[in-house]
């Protein structure tokens, strides 16, 4: 196994790419979907079962982990991999996005941000330097630069100011990250939906130099059309030979559209969160297992799916345990959704390698257009 | 595999017994502990993992299943085994106990009992005949006779009246059960803590004749001393050559004491319920994982335990995920508790077979007397 972090592109099809990220903790096949293990667990899943769905890498959240159990405690306990029993690569975000979306009483300055915990109201501080320290204590393999995300809606001027602050923070992140062989630091492009700002941000990041580049500030309510609009040009501003990570995306059709536009990595809570709210994702679209139409249905969610939920249980059972608020409903639906997402990624990788992405995408949309199987 | 239900005693040690119940769906090694899968799931566990802990048989609850998803629906879907993905033996209770403890507005007559659902207030009826029908629709391997449990505290006269009603219902249950090769009907001894009533009840049941005999009306708040007092004589009133099932028991030391007194089968929600409330059972007693002493503890719950929670996670992790209300806390602690219970049963079976139960029980109590490992 390699002792350094590297990325090899093995095939392209149009703007879409497939390849392999190598790390000392294992390979990440791209395009990759990263399940989210917010607070040291992918909710309702054992890590060996997350791996069994085909996940090569998990995402952990700096904001949640710094508050509880704290980065220092995780470090004393041997790091996040050991703590949560996942020995493959972990990417941690920088905390910037969650501070914006979850914390109370934020106070922003050039230096960083102070805020109060949403758990107990305690006061905390994040800066590029502290975020790098926390992510080092957690032991993450892919570290994200600390950035600021403006609350939407925002004027173009506010987006520009915020992006330039994030670029100054990106440089401080790079300096604070230091020399850590086998670990990677990714910069995060900002600039909202404004092409000039995206280009300026990308240029600033390339000037600093990172092992990978994220596209931030999307999937925050702008809608798929606006997001794809940015993805039509933004990946092209980034170096060809480094992985491109679209943060917080998304629904299956968002993922397919992003991969078509040259994205290599994504993460989203959607498959696991949906599992806990009774939503399943299949080749034929979304299934609401709460719906009474499933009450007597002996068929699996998707007869072509090989996940445990589809292999061994009827829609009627899944409906029953969801309605009865049984934990197994979250366990089985989350497993199914993560399995479906990873199967989709494998399909995309195979199609790109074969130069048949167009056919794959057409079949993907055709199956969804059919909709769910007819009620019995 | 056998096509009939049978019980073979293979060894005894004092009053304790070990043996095998054979059914068309597999063998049940006794003494057996049956995890409770109330509404079609052992909470927070996948059935294959319940099996991996060593469970030979599960218990399902007639009361819960008749209300939701209904016995008729389960039958249309192929029976409870298929519905919940458990192909080994299932014992169902008769519904009598839960009607007493959970339902609203009960109305009792010689014929049976009407009540309102605790879920939606809908009106339902149970009688010996309807309970037999429901348990047949569910497809359970071991069917329990329909009985009445008096609310405690009760006068001896009330306990006697209730027991005699249950004995008349036991006869009606036997008649309604019919001829079902491979399936068993168990009668339930009642009579509270009064020896004469227990003897009268046992005689009535033996006169009717059952494939097995349960001891009901214990573990309902009378305390361990009173329960053991009854178990000092009650099993002796029952036929030697049929399994004896103590309903709703219990804590590990209750189980050991019951096995010493000649009990072959038990069930209890305790290991799974405790798992969801942060209580773990180990060789050294009870561990409250919520306690702050575990916050920095890198050691497993029990270093000698081979369950996934102990093999791969620290007390600090279990503490963290419990405090963060993560589903994995319920999953891992339930798994550990069920594993511990089954390991205890295997220890009891092996000790009885070797004629060394006394030593085993002494070591069991000695380890518990030591208490949990010292904090770091």
Swiss-Prot record, chains A, B:
Entries under InterPro entries matching the protein = ArchSynthase1/Queuine_TRR (IPR050076), TGT (IPR004803), TGT-like_sf (IPR036511), tRNA_ribo_trans-like (IPR002616)
Q: Which residues bind substrate?
A: 93-97, 147, 190, 217
The chemistry this enzyme catalyses reads: 7-aminomethyl-7-carbaguanine + guanosine(34) in tRNA = 7-aminomethyl-7-carbaguanosine(34) in tRNA + guanine
Which keywords describe this protein according to UniProt? Glycosyltransferase, Metal-binding, Queuosine biosynthesis, Transferase, tRNA processing, Zinc
UniProt signal peptide:
none
Q: Where does Zn(2+) bind?
A: 305, 307, 310, 336
Instruction: State one Pfam family annotation.
Output: TGT
- Name its co-factor(s): Zn(2+)
Q: Pathway, per UniProt? A: tRNA modification; tRNA-queuosine biosynthesis
Give GO BP annotations, semicolon-separated: queuosine biosynthetic process; tRNA wobble guanine modification; tRNA-guanine transglycosylation
The EC number(s) given in the record are 2.4.2.29
The record's region (RNA binding) falls at 248-254
Q: Which GO terms describe its cellular component?
A: cytosol
Classification via Gene3D superfamilies = Queuine tRNA-ribosyltransferase-like (3.20.20.105)
Which terms in the Gene Ontology molecular function aspect does this entry carry? metal ion binding; tRNA-guanosine(34) queuine transglycosylase activity
Q: Cofactor note, please?
A: Binds 1 zinc ion per subunit.
| Active site residues of this protein | 93 (proton acceptor), 267 (nucleophile)
- PANTHER family given for it? QUEUINE TRNA-RIBOSYLTRANSFERASE (PTHR46499:SF1)
Q: Which family does it belong to?
A: Belongs to the queuine tRNA-ribosyltransferase family.
Assembly and interaction partners: Homodimer. Within each dimer, one monomer is responsible for RNA recognition and catalysis, while the other monomer binds to the replacement base PreQ1.
Record function comment: Catalyzes the base-exchange of a guanine (G) residue with the queuine precursor 7-aminomethyl-7-deazaguanine (PreQ1) at position 34 (anticodon wobble position) in tRNAs with GU(N) anticodons (tRNA-Asp, -Asn, -His and -Tyr). Catalysis occurs through a double-displacement mechanism. The nucleophile active site attacks the C1' of nucleotide 34 to detach the guanine base from the RNA, forming a covalent enzyme-RNA intermediate. The proton acceptor active site deprotonates the incoming PreQ1, allowing a nucleophilic attack on the C1' of the ribose to form the product.
The protein's matches in NCBIfam families, at most eight in alphabetical order, are given as: Q_tRNA_tgt, tgt_general
Name of this protein: Queuine tRNA-ribosyltransferase
**Gene, per the UniProt record:** tgt
């Amino acid at each position: 196994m390699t002792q350094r972090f590297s990325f090899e592109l093995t095939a392209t099809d149009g703007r879409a790419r497939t390849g392999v990220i190598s790390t000392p903790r294992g390979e990440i096949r791209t395009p990759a979907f990263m399940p989210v293990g917010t607070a040291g667990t992918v909710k309702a899943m054992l890590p060996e079962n997350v791996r069994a769905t085909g996940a090569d890498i998990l995402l952990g959240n700096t904001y949640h982990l710094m508050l509880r159990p704290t980065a220092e405690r995780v470090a004393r306990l041997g790091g996040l991999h050991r703590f949560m029993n996942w020995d493959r690569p972990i990417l941690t975000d920088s905390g910037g996005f969650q501070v914006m979306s979850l914390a109370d009483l934020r106070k922003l300055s050039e230096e960083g941000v102070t805020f109060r915990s949403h758990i107990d109201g305690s006061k905390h501080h994040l800066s590029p330097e502290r975020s790098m320290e926390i992510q080092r204590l957690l032991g993450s393999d892919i570290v994200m630069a600390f950035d600021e995300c403006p609350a939407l809606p925002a004027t173009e001027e506010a987006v520009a100011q915020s992006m330039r602050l994030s670029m100054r923070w990106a440089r401080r992140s790079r300096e604070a990250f230091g020399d850590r062989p086998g670990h990677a630091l990714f910069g995060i492009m900002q600039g909202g939906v404004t092409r000039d700002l995206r280009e300026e941000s990308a240029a600033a990041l390339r000037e600093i130099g990172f092992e990978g580049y994220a596209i931030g500030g999307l999937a925050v309510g702008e809608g798929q059309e606006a997001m794809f609009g940015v993805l039509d040009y933004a990946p092209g501003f980034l170096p060809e030979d480094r992985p491109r990570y679209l943060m917080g995306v998304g629904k299956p059709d968002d993922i397919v559209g992003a991969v078509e536009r040259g994205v290599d990595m994504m993460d989203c809570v959607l498959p696991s969160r949906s599992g806990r709210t009774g939503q399943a994702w299949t080749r034929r679209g979304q299934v609401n297992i709460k719906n009474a139409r499933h009450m007597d249905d002996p068929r699996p969610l998707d007869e072509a799916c090989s996940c445990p939920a589809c292999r061994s249980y009827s829609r009627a059972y899944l409906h029953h345990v969801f309605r009865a608020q049984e934990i197994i409903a979250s366990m089985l639906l989350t497993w199914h959704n993560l399995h479906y997402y990873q199967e989709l990624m494998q399909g995309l990788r195979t199609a790109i390698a074969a130069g048949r992405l167009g056919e794959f995408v057409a079949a993907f949309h055709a199956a969804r257009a059919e909709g769910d199987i007819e009620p019995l």
